[in-house]
């Protein structure tokens, strides 16, 4: 409402997750929430386009290094689901993408930057920042 009232246009970039596109073990709640977030972004893109408000989504895969999500029970749950130790999580996540890269917070920031500073005619779109997870390729 505020952005519409200001009549300046603008950008909304939501951070969702690769898990909204592809399923994983023991992940129903999180995956469902992220899929809903991605669809909400597309709906808002259509709804707000006449106001020149662009809505896009950045989809990271597991950002293990530098993310507080791994400090709680989440890391233990993910490690258990994959049958590995918590210490093995960064390498495990890197090996499951085709570039074999660990995804860092600055990689997500680069995705946001691309929407804000470069892709100025983009709305309703998704950039995956996941090192290439074929099952999560946007179709």
Task: Locate predicted features.
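A glycine/serine/threonine-rich, flexible loop-to-helix segment
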Residues: 63-96, 138-139
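Residue(s) in the substrate-gating loop at a strand-loop-helix junction
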Residues: 17
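Active-site helix of classical SDR
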Residues: 8, 33, 41
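Short, small/polar-rich loop/turn modules that mediate ligand/substrate recognition or access, typified
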Residues: 49, 54, 122-124
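C-terminal substrate-recognition "lid" of short-chain dehydrogenase/reductases
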Residues: 99-129, 134
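Hydrophobic alpha-helix immediately C-terminal to the catalytic Tyr-X-X-X-Lys motif of short-chain
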Residues: 36, 40-44, 48, 58
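Alpha-helical segment proximal to the catalytic Tyr-Lys
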Residues: 1, 5, 46-47
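Active-site loop-to-helix junction immediately N-terminal to the catalytic Tyr of the SDR YXXXK motif
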Residues: 23-31, 43
